[in-house]
């Protein structure tokens, strides 16, 4: 594990160099975005190494794995405090496992799911089990790929007002994924489309404040940062020794 920790530290320096260079190219300050280490493919030991290497913000795509990581890390009180987000598809029967455990849910892709999260959160707030509304991002299928979930741009335009009124959630922004296997130009267009949609929604709904844009992964995070992403979700480039850092 010592060799893995050394790799993690060296890899983090390389990632941050690229991260800050992308922000510089866009004329954005270095604190304009945050790096999320997606730990969904690794165990608790690897996550501990990532924390020791300097990462403080993590994400999981399955509720049971989120709970497992939090339970495992609780056995390491010597580590600094970290936060976990939920980024994967969330089924309604798993909502209670995520509420209060995930700082931010990135993947609210339907009005039905938003309503379900809100109603469960309200009950937990009333029972004293949750401090306040659950922070969420709305997943938007900007690219229009049939294989991807989320609101279409037209659907989120129609639902934005209702989402803003749900008492148990606080909508913080939007999330999307770029098309699979496409060239960088297409990825940049998807990320720019998310930013433009956010600006449009804020203009149409003054009660909506959407500071967060979650987009960009291991292969395309630099393009995302150049187009305004505030949260990049990096898995393989952080954790996989085999991933080629360009």
Ranges and model annotations:
Residues 106, 229-246:
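Gly/Pro- and small hydrophobic-enriched strand-loop and loop-to-helix capping segments
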Residues 1-221, 225-227, 239:
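Conserved alpha/beta-domain cores
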């Amino acid at each position: 594990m010592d060799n893995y920790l050394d790799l993690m530290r060296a890899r983090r320096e390389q990632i941050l160099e690229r991260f800050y260079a992308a922000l510089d190219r866009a004329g954005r300050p270095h604190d304009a975005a945050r790096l999320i280490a997606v730990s969904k493919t690794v165990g608790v030991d690897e996550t501990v190494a990532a924390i020791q290497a300097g990462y403080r913000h993590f994400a999981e795509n399955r509720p049971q794995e989120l709970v497992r990581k939090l339970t495992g890390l609780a056995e390491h009180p010597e580590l600094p405090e970290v936060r976990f987000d939920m980024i994967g598809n969330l089924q309604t029967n798993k909502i209670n496992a995520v509420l209060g455990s995930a700082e931010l849910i990135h993947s609210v892709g339907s009005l039905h799911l938003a309503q379900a999260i809100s109603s469960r959160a309200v009950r937990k707030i009333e029972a004293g089990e949750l401090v306040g509304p659950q922070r969420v991002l709305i997943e938007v299928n900007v690219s229009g790929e049939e294989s991807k979930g989320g609101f279409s741009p037209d659907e989120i335009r129609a639902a934005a007002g209702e989402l803003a009124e749900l008492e148990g959630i606080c909508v913080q922004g939007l999330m999307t994924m770029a098309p699979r296997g496409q060239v960088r130009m297409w990825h940049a267009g998807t990320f720019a489309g998310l930013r433009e949609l956010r600006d449009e929604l804020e203009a149409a709904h003054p009660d909506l404040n959407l500071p967060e844009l979650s987009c960009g992964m291991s292969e395309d995070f630099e393009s995302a940062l150049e187009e305004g992403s505030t949260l990049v979700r990096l898995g393989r480039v952080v954790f996989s020794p085999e991933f080629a850092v360009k």
